From Swiss-Prot:
Pfam families, per the entry: MARVEL (PF01284)
Glycosylated residues, chain numbering: N108
Role, per record: May play a role in cell differentiation in the intestinal epithelium.
Protein name in the entry: Proteolipid protein 2
MARVEL domain ranges (all copies): 19-137
One GO cellular component, as annotated: membrane
Keyword line: Glycoprotein, Membrane, Transmembrane, Transmembrane helix
Localization: Membrane
Gene that encodes the chain: PLP2
Membrane topology according to the record: Multi-pass membrane protein
PANTHER family: MARVEL-CONTAINING POTENTIAL LIPID RAFT-ASSOCIATED PROTEIN (PTHR22776), PROTEOLIPID PROTEIN 2 (PTHR22776:SF4)
Parts of the chain that traverse the membrane: 25-45, 48-68, 85-105, 112-132
Length: 152
């Protein structure tokens, strides 16, 4: 039993980690790391703003695991492209608002760093929303140019 698990484990691990090399995988990983850094900066200065970083880090980690393990093809009751688009769009808007409020308040160095990193996170989430937009990914087929009824 242990030998069969050992033989299938590298294949499973390779399948799971191959997602992290894609553009979407890299973006989700960067979102998780950036949310963690912003959380650390907010927790040292003002803990009231850390809720956004915690929630977005959890959501990004959930989507990372779902896409990494290919669960989005197995769980089809959820429309994953639209869910991911709305997650990133809401995160970009909330990070933009929160960062502007934090930078206007002017606090200590870690609060200013969190505000500046929040603006970077808003840009990252906005870019992720742009590339995730489901209607942008649909390909339109060209209309037929030949007459269907024959020569006129």
């Amino acid at each position: 039993m242990a030998d069969s698990e050992r033989l299938t484990a590298p294949g499973c691990w390779a399948a799971c980690t191959s997602f992290s090399r894609t553009r979407k995988g890299f973006l989700l990983f960067a979102e998780i790391i950036l949310c963690l850094v912003i959380l650390i900066c907010f927790s040292t200065s003002t803990s009231g703003y850390s809720f956004l970083s915690v929630i977005e880090m959890i959501f990004a980690a959930i989507f990372f695991v779902v896409y990494m393990c290919d669960l989005h093809t197995k769980i089809q009751i959820i429309n994953w492209p639209w869910s991911d688009f709305f997650r990133t769009l809401v995160a970009a808007i909330l990070y933009l608002i929160t960062s502007i409020v934090v930078l206007v308040e002017r606090g200590n160095g870690s609060k200013i760093a969190a505000g500046a990193l929040g603006l970077c996170a808003a840009g990252l989430f906005g870019y992720d929303a742009y590339i995730t937009f489901p209607l942008r990914q649909q390909r339109h087929t060209a209309a037929p140019t030949d007459p269907a009824d024959g020569p006129v």
